Amino acid sequence: NLPQPESATIGAFWVLKTYYIAYFISFLTLFNIWYSNHNLFQIVENIDNTVVILNGILIFEITLIPYFTLWLTQDAYSIASETTFGLLFIAINITYNMAVKAVHKSDPYNDKLIKADYDNLYALIPLAVILIGFGLSYSVFIPGIYISCLIAVIMWIVIARIHRKGVENGKWKI
């Protein structure tokens, strides 16, 4: 649950910024996974058990987001809460990318899937951003992990959109 500000002032809202940022990161992650899977499964013709199992693991990881988000919001300057929040997002990113690779492997002759090229290296950029956040949190700026998670999720969305537009316009590899 998001707490309500104690008064109708910007200052009261600002006190709760960690809650709102963490909630926003969680929402963007859920939306992006749903939207990406929606687009991916529109063109997939065959899936195997590996795809189903990896998506089941991904769903489990997603169910952990509210728990770790709440822990983070209770103490955004805790290395333990920052670390577990970041590790969850790393796990989600890795599992999602593994699931996409599994989809490609289970449907290797699907021309639409090959053209869409969901299995690309650009998907690893958000993971690198989160890892940079770990470096920040453990060296100079404790909230670095959750800020890097926000940046990574936004990058994930932007990269996917640019990539999709590039494929639609014939600018990416086909």
Question: Each PLM stretch: what is its role?
Answer:
Residues N1-I174:
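Multi-pass alpha-helical transmembrane bundle typical of ion/small-solute transporters
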